[in-house]
A protein has these predicted regions:
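Conserved acidic/glycine
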Residues: 1-62, 68
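Cofactor-binding active-site loop characterized by glycine-rich and histidine/acidic residues
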Residues: 38-41, 46-134
């Protein structure tokens, strides 16, 4: 790709099929996931999150792209790195964090932790351990 002044030439830019608004929303979603996971990592290090806490840092674009490609009625089930999926499908960050920290306001009333929460409303059916699940 040739560059002029650090930008791609107009002839090299590809139409993504998404509007500027959709692309901005995708960026905001990726940023939300990154910041959420950074905070979850801090809380885990401080002992506020028990059990395991498998972070989604570095994979934000994957789940946001997946959500952008889904059609009405599609459902998601994932492996143990699932916080990004929860946030990208529209689950409330406060509810997800409440679950991670074992509070009753969490999606599984604080009993599911990092890997075992779900939202029927958002068509998200949880994260599952790798043994025998994949």
């Amino acid at each position: 790709m040739s560059r002029k002044g650090g930008k791609a030439e107009k002839s090299e830019l590809k139409n993504t099929g998404f509007s500027a608004e959709q692309e901005q929303r995708a960026y905001r979603d990726m940023l939300l996931i990154r910041r959420f996971e950074e905070k979850a990592g801090q809380l885990y290090g401080m002992g506020f999150i028990g059990g395991f806490c498998h972070l989604y840092i570095g994979q934000e674009a994957v789940v946001v792209g997946l959500q952008m490609a889904q059609k009405e009625g599609d459902q998601v089930i994932t492996s143990y790195r699932d916080h990004g999926h929860m946030l990208a499908c529209g689950m409330d960050p406060k509810g997800v964090m409440a679950e991670l920290t074992g509070r009753r306001g969490g999606y599984s009333k604080g009993k599911g932790g990092s890997m075992h929460m779900f939202s029927r409303e958002k068509q998200f059916f949880g994260g599952h351990g790798i043994v025998g699940a994949q």
